Amino acid sequence: MSKNIHKHRILILDFGSQYTQLIARRVREIGVYCELWAWDVTEEQIREFNPDGIILSGGPESVTESDSPRAPEYVFNAGVPVLGVCYGMQTMAEQLGGKVESSDKREFGYAKVKLVKDSELFHNIEDAITEDGRPELDVWMSHGDKVMEIPVDFVTIAVTPTCPHAAMANEAKRFYGVQFHPEVTHTVQGARMLERFVKEICHCEALWTPATIIEDAVARIREQVGTDEVILGLSGGVDSSVVAMLIHRAVGKQLTCVFVDNGLLRLNEGQQVMEMFGDHFGLNIIKVDAEERFLSALKGIADPELKRKAIGRVFVEVFDDESKKLKNAKWLAQGTIYPDVIESAASKTGKAHVIKSHHNVGGLPDDMKMGLVEPLRELFKDEVRRVGLELGLPYNMLYRHPFPGPGLGVRVLGEVKKEYCDLLRRADAIFIEELHNADLYNKVSQAFTVFLPVRSVGVMGDGRKYDWVVSLRAVETIDFMTAHWAHLPYDFLGHVSNRIINEINGISRVVYDISGKPPATIEWE
């Protein structure tokens, strides 16, 4: 009998902070299951979830505005510990009778917080000792408003020179508020604070580990699928690969994977996928060579959004054709992960904004009458990777840089042609190979090559050449929300450029993209 890995659970209410998912990831890293919900949940939903503790996230709004979000009243009557972070602390203070004011001086960035009273939250946690002998913490602040009066029965447990109540506590009710962000790495002891809250204050046991997640997923897949057959679109990416391994472990040959080679993959990628999953791991795989079909659908299309939609549409058509041949398949497996679930379940106050359409969300035919199997829908990407390692997938494959769903379709600018894809594949392979050779691959967050549909004059020997241009792109980022261009050594870039131009007939010039995000996006399209 597998352990109940959901036995202990934390509920995180999202007030719109860019860091909210980080809170959830930190709690999961502690080994405890948690879910992230919009702030406007009902008492009934909270009761049904039955959390051992609740965390109120930060957010961009001001508590001083009458229509700003508030925690459901039941949060403070549920009898469980509550931790308010930044905006979460402010709304806790205001809702429980304290006073919050807008400040003309924002606190943003590193700050030193002095602990003025002992508390369960900060027990044995310090970065330094002040002259008067009190513990001090190095933290990350990001707020304009501040708590000016704490509620009755609360005590101030930390201060900064500009923030009279940097943290507060009601030890009897186990309510805590911190004005800083313990979830970000800049708050040096942040992970320990969250661990104290989750384990010592909420009394949660660490049951959420890669091994127990696999055990639980396998049991659930077996229960759901029974003796039926399952079909999965295997791309060779992290999510679909881990889904394939999980379902294969659960039901073996009842799983059939369909690998669609759309002509938009990296160099030798199709061959690598077939060798790894078919030959090495022994999965049932059908390989569909659909390059011509995809390139034909992309003919004459230059707009990036239209290209994405065309690629998505053709994938669905090809997959649908193959699934109809598998008469006994009753279940469709998908690599949906928790951030996809969070995105689609946006708060009913709805403030989401689409920047780029995602090729893998929705879009399956209405007449595909199959049940869905989504074994990763509770997991963040970093958890998916750790589960993959536990399942025996190679590290280099799981921690490879992100590759867009539409593949080279959005790395060839403008119209996609076979000639362009072939040139780009080879140029990109050289760039990635050299990053590995120079031990730079894992020092950048993402690196790739872009094909520019413009010709440039070059010189080769005594002759003049008039060939295509490619751009190298490498960025450093923590969360892919913002990114800096990677300052790769000039001699390295020169070496890569020489190799590409000398080894690939058809490319005459290599440029390096030095745009950050913002204002640019990481991918060009």
Curated annotation (Swiss-Prot):
It holds the Pfam family GMP_synt_C. SUPFAM superfamilies: Adenine nucleotide alpha hydrolases-like, Class I glutamine amidotransferase-like, GMP synthetase C-terminal dimerisation domain. The active site is at residues 86, 181, 183. It catalyses: XMP + L-glutamine + ATP + H2O = GMP + L-glutamate + AMP + diphosphate + 2 H(+). The keyword Nucleotide-binding applies. PROSITE patterns: GATASE_TYPE_1, GMPS_ATP_PPASE. ATP binds at residues 235-241. Pathway: Purine metabolism; GMP biosynthesis; GMP from XMP (L-Gln route): step 1/1. InterPro entries: Class_I_gatase-like, GATASE, GMP_synth_C, GMP_synth_GATase, GMP_synthase, GMPS_ATP_PPase_dom, NAD/GMP_synthase, Rossmann-like_a/b/a_fold. Catalyzes the synthesis of GMP from XMP. Homodimer. HAMAP family: GMP_synthase (MF_00344). This is GMP synthase [glutamine-hydrolyzing]. It comes from Tolumonas auensis (strain DSM 9187 / NBRC 110442 / TA 4).
